[in-house]
């Protein structure tokens, strides 16, 4: 019923505590009052690790696999496992910890409460909008952190799958070989042009068309070949264009 709409727990409202003339005790309502640096860390935790990267992965794969509601994707074994790994497995070792909220607890609640909530009318088509402007923050920051920490991001699998999924999405062909309309993106025409010649169900039609995109630090924040995952993303992409059901088969293979 209607009351379920208001059960959008968890709600994390984090506000900078700068009220020169005093303020009500917002903490009693569950609001986190803190300094600006901590507010920024909470935001970074969300957009680079615990929430936004998961949304983008669900958006591009949701379009390819025929979903119209993000919440429904969490009932999908492969997609729910993909975002679990992006957030809890690959994101956590390099997450920004704001101190006032546990990143693990936040990500767990995102996975089990927030995204599966059927009263959140998010569609993959809407969230896939402007993905070229988002991947640098949503994936690039974690990739850069791995390079800084381990010298390479080659240990990653779920994040390369998400990026390969975006590249596959750019073909505008679903996993059954049917065309779909790409969501609005300022780079849409340029990106489609870079994929020129790549054809669904013809893996041999791929002759390196992704190299310019995957090496573009303006998009990802880092050259993905220098990060050690460019070749892996190309290989995943080729598997995902192999024919009907190839995207599903690729997800099953690597998750």
Name the predicted role of every residue range:
Residues 39-46:
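Conserved phosphate-binding loops in nucleotide/dinucleotide-binding enzymes
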Residues 46-62:
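Conserved phosphate/anionic-ligand binding catalytic regions in large, soluble enzymes, centered on
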Residues 20-39, 61-62:
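Active-site-adjacent bridging/hinge elements
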Residues 17-18, 24-25, 200-202:
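ABC transporter nucleotide-binding domains
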Residues 61-190:
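C-terminal catalytic subdomain
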Residues 2-6:
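Short, small-residue-biased leader/transition segments that mark boundaries at the very start
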Residues 156-255:
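C-terminal amphipathic alpha-helical interaction region
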